């Protein structure tokens, strides 16, 4: 998901997506440890998506404080 798409969502929706992506990341890491993961690049994609979403949330917090 791109940053522009994330900015169109509400903060609550973003937080919900972060929660679901964290669960997915946990499952991917578990699959990696047990040797069942085929697409290892997915871990990196999920981590970057979480970071993008947290960045947008933080931008909104900073804008609200000004």
From Swiss-Prot:
HAMAP family assigned to the protein according to its UniProt record, in alphabetical order: Ribosomal_uL29 (MF_00374)
UniProt cross-references to Pfam families, sorted A to Z: Ribosomal_L29 (PF00831)
Family: Belongs to the universal ribosomal protein uL29 family.
Annotated InterPro entries: Ribosomal_protein_uL29, Ribosomal_uL29, Ribosomal_uL29_CS, Ribosomal_uL29_sf
CDD domains given in the database record: Ribosomal_L29_HIP
Domain of life: Bacteria
Single Gene Ontology BP annotation: translation
Keywords: Ribonucleoprotein, Ribosomal protein
Origin species: Bacillus licheniformis (strain ATCC 14580 / DSM 13 / JCM 2505 / CCUG 7422 / NBRC 12200 / NCIMB 9375 / NCTC 10341 / NRRL NRS-1264 / Gibson 46)
GO CC terms of this entry: cytosolic large ribosomal subunit
Protein name: Large ribosomal subunit protein uL29
GO molecular function: structural constituent of ribosome
